[in-house]
Structures are given as structure tokens and as C-alpha cells.
């Protein structure tokens, strides 16, 4: 199996220039599905910390580059929306976040905020023993005892060890949200109205945009609940 893919075929969210070279690195299997960006692309093309795959591998051997609190050894490890990228030796911390063009970008955050990660709940399943399993947007799962406390489309902030939910943001009218895909990717605002669509069609969401008087509309799938500290580099709690 090849470790490369054509640049023209990569998802629009990848932060690569499509016309520079014919091929780019292919992500390994892991979280975020097809949207996952190989760590090498972030280190080389976005941050400029390495010039080659060889340099990336050497940097990773030092165990000082972490994703969501865990040291990474594979330069093809996929990273994606809301992942936390930490460089311990540099004391630099970033949250991966879609910009207004829909590409994944790096938002600097402080060390405290780097200790946990936001996830959108995309599914709930009851499992043996009576607990409820929450499925998050990146493929991760989490067991909770109180099934009624969390709903699909809510957001939770989970500690990097996965053992504690440190914040919970409810999906409802009046909630602060960001659009993560589509024509309005990267925009932030407050939900004005959730338009429930009968049948299997997607619900629409009307959002009052932050910092201007505009309102925009997107589908529920593209909306993630955040809080006021989420985009300024502070802690989510």
C-alpha cells in the first residue's frame, strides 16, 4: 500500500497547496477518518519545524511532540479538528481549528487549555451494565453513567487521559457555536433558531454571527457548541 496520495485528491480541509507537487503524504489509519491530516504535513508545511520525513522522525523520537497528551512516534499519525498539539520543549500548544476557508489551522492556546480536548457528541448507545457510550466526532468513545445528562450535538471537554469530563456545553438556541464545514466554516455566532426538518433531511440552524450584524444558515451537522474562551487561547472550563 502506498504512503502517498495525489495532492489534488486530498480533502479541502487539508492545509496543503494542491499545485506545488503531484503527491503528498498519506495519513495512517486512525481518528478523524478521511479528514485526518498526517502530522508530517503540520510539522513541515504549516509550522516549518522540519524539512523532510527524516527530520520529522528524528523529532518524534525525542518524545516531546504530543497529540492530546500522548507522545507520537509516527509522522503519518492523523490529526484533525479540535486535537491538541503540544511541543513540550518549545512550550508551545495549539488547538486544531477550521479557518474561514474550511482548512484546518493552528490556534495557539495556553498550557492549561492543552490538558483537555473538546468533542462533539454524534451518537449515544446503551451498553452492557447499564452505562451509556458517547460517540464523538473524531471516532473516540466515552462511557457515562447518566444517559439523560448528554444529548447528541452537545459538546463535552474531556481530559487528555479520557477519564474526566471537565465541561459540558448543551446544543440549544442561545448557545455559542462555530461552523466547522461548508460555506461558513470558521464563523462563530449564537444559535438563533434550530429548524427541525421532518423526515431524514438535515435540520437547519440559523446563527447570529459574532462581531457583525449578519445572520447565516447552515446544517446541524456542521455546527459545534463551544464557549466564550474557546477561540482566545484560554481554558475551556
From Swiss-Prot:
SUPFAM superfamilies: Alpha-L RNA-binding motif. Pfam families: Ribosomal_S4e, RS4NT. One of its GO terms (cellular component) is cytosolic small ribosomal subunit. Residues 37-99 form the S4 RNA-binding domain. One of its GO terms (biological process) is translation. One of its GO terms (molecular function) is rRNA binding. Keywords: Ribonucleoprotein, Ribosomal protein, RNA-binding, rRNA-binding. It comes from the Archaea. Belongs to the eukaryotic ribosomal protein eS4 family. This is Small ribosomal subunit protein eS4. It comes from Natronomonas pharaonis (strain ATCC 35678 / DSM 2160 / CIP 103997 / JCM 8858 / NBRC 14720 / NCIMB 2260 / Gabara).
Amino acid at each position: 500500500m502506498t504512503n502517498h496520495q495525489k495532492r489534488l485528491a486530498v480533502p479541502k480541509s487539508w492545509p496543503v497547496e494542491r499545485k506545488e507537487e503531484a503527491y503528498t503524504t498519506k495519513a495512517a489509519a486512525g481518528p478523524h477518518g478521511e479528514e485526518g491530516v498526517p502530522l508530517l504535513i503540520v510539522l513541515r508545511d504549516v509550522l516549518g519545524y522540519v524539512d523532510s520525513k527524516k527530520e520529522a522522525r528524528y523529532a518524534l523520537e525525542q518524545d516531546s511532540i504530543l497529540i492530546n497528551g500522548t507522545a507520537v512516534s509516527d509522522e503519518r499519525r492523523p490529526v484533525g479538528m479540535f486535537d491538541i498539539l503540544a511541543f513540550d520543549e518549545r512550550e508551545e500548544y495549539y488547538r486544531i481549528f477550521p479557518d474561514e476557508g474550511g482548512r484546518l489551522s493552528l490556534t495557539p492556546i495556553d498550557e492549561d487549555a492543552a490538558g483537555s480536548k473538546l468533542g462533539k457528541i454524534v451518537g449515544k448507545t446503551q451498553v452492557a451494565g447499564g452505562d451509556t457510550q458517547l460517540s464523538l466526532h473524531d471516532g473516540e468513545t466515552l462511557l457515562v453513567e447518566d444517559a439523560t445528562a448528554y444529548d447528541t450535538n452537545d459538546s463535552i471537554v474531556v481530559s487528555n487521559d479520557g477519564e474526566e469530563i471537565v465541561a459540558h456545553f448543551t446544543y440549544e438556541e442561545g448557545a455559542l457555536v462555530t461552523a466547522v464545514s461548508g460555506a461558513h466554516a470558521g464563523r462563530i455566532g449564537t444559535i438563533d433558531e434550530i429548524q427541525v426538518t421532518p423526515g431524514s433531511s438535515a435540520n437547519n440552524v440559523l446563527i447570529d454571527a459574532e462581531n457583525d450584524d449578519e445572520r447565516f444558515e447552515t446544517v446541524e451537522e456542521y455546527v459545534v457548541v463551544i464557549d466564550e474562551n474557546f477561540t482566545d487561547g484560554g481554558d475551556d472550563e
